[in-house]
Design a protein with these regions (language model features):
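Conserved PLP-enzyme active-site core in the AAT-like
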Residues: 1-278, 282-290, 296-306, 311-326, ...
Length: 356
């Protein structure tokens, strides 16, 4: 039980005592010179887990996705991705601004492009048309509510792209959630794609960092882009040390977060005025809708007054993310707050119209 129940994101997780200890005692060197032994251990472990030749430690998931785009496209090309993908929505148009590539967003049912959608979107050679440079996938899918796709589904999309000589990048910020939920190995999801990014600082609770993995040659290019973006860090083993603890100690417990998300989703489904598709609650994200005018905004502020923090992601939609700093009692407290607020609305004909 925590004083504040913070369901805004799994990025809010605090480092564990074991991480703090590992950070304090980490063996370090200059990583731009490729002489930091702790970073090298982390990158080697990431490569092994993803089944790729090499790994690269980067500052964030955003930087991991960007260096992957930059290393696999050239200006004037187009990347195919889902309309609700993180790269398209939340990465500050970096692919366009820094990479000079055009994004081609495609609407999907659960966040995953089908092989047919990819096949139809790949551009033919024509002087008028930007050549397709990359296909980007996301698993688990953030804006679709932590939805999963299987290694086989990724393989089917990658086969279509491969036939057109187009590489595939996987934004696997939460790929360990997918792996734990489906009881599959991360390397199975990564096998069909040329590059994969995963994050240490979300459900795995490290304070900083993501890994990009792919072929040795790809990582060489990504390392140059990282340097150009100002991401060449020096004695960064102090951060990598926490990342090693994240990978060694924090993966299996993600199942608890999934169970808590399910409990939260099932509780929400019983409330008046709340709409939720429980079939989408597959990992640690719960998205639900309050369709009354002003309802979502009012729910956020009334929850905050009860020390329950949730995040509005659209006019009527709210996202809750479970993580290691939210336990089962906290979930029940959040549900208690939702119940009090929505029952009160029910008795008084809805939330105040101005949303306050
Ligand atoms: N997502 C954050 C916000 O940016 C929305 C969150 O709170 O969920 N890919 C995916 C699928 C992500 O969800 C995120 C972060 C990233 C990439 C970027 O990672 P960071 O925040 O490390 O740059």
């Amino acid at each position: 039980m925590h004083d504040v129940v913070d369901l805004r994101s799994d990025t809010l997780t605090l480092p564990t005592p074991a991480m703090r200890e590992a950070m304090a005692t980490a063996e370090v060197g200059d990583d731009v010179w490729e002489e930091d032994p702790t970073v090298q251990r982390l990158e080697a472990l990431a490569a092994e887990l993803t089944g790729k030749e090499s790994g690269l430690f980067v500052a964030s998931g955003t930087m991991g996705n960007l260096v992957s785009v930059l290393s696999q496209t050239r200006p004037g090309q187009e990347i195919i991705l889902d309309l609700d993908s993180h790269i398209f929505n939340y990465e500050v148009a970096s692919a366009a601004v820094i990479g000079g590539v055009q994004t081609r967003p495609i609407r999907t049912e659960r966040g995953f492009l089908s092989p047919q959608q990819v096949s139809e979107a790949i551009r033919p050679a024509n002087i008028h048309i930007p050549p397709t440079g990359l296909v980007c996938l996301e698993n688990t899918h953030n804006r679709h509510g932590g939805t999963l796709c299987t290694p086989e589904e990724i393989g089917a999309v990658a086969a279509v792209a491969r036939a057109a000589a187009v590489p595939v990048h996987l934004d696997g910020a939460r790929i360990f959630n997918a792996a734990v939920a489906l009881k599959r190995r991360v390397r199975e999801f990564a096998a069909p794609v040329a590059s994969v990014t995963f994050c240490l600082s979300k459900g795995l609770a490290a304070p900083v960092g993501s890994l990009v993995c792919g072929s040795r040659e790809f990582i060489g290019r990504a390392r140059r882009w990282r340097k150009m973006l100002g991401g060449g860090m020096r004695q960064v083993g102090v951060l990598a040390a926490a990342g090693l603890v994240a990978l060694e100690q924090m993966v299996e417990r993600l199942a608890e977060d999934h169970a808590n998300a399910k409990r939260l989703g099932e509780g929400l489904a019983r409330l008046p005025g709340v709409r939720i598709d429980l079939s989408r609650v597959q990992t640690n994200i719960v998205i639900f809708f309050v369709d009354r005018p002003g309802g979502a905004q009012t729910l956020v502020s009334e929850c905050a007054a009860r020390k329950v923090k949730i995040h509005q992601i659209g006019p009527t939609s709210i996202r809750c993310v479970t993580h290691k700093d939210v336990d089962r009692d906290d979930i029940d407290r959040a549900l208690q707050a939702f119940t009090e607020i929505t029952r009160h609305w029910e008795r008084h004909g809805g939330p105040p119209a101005n949303g306050h």
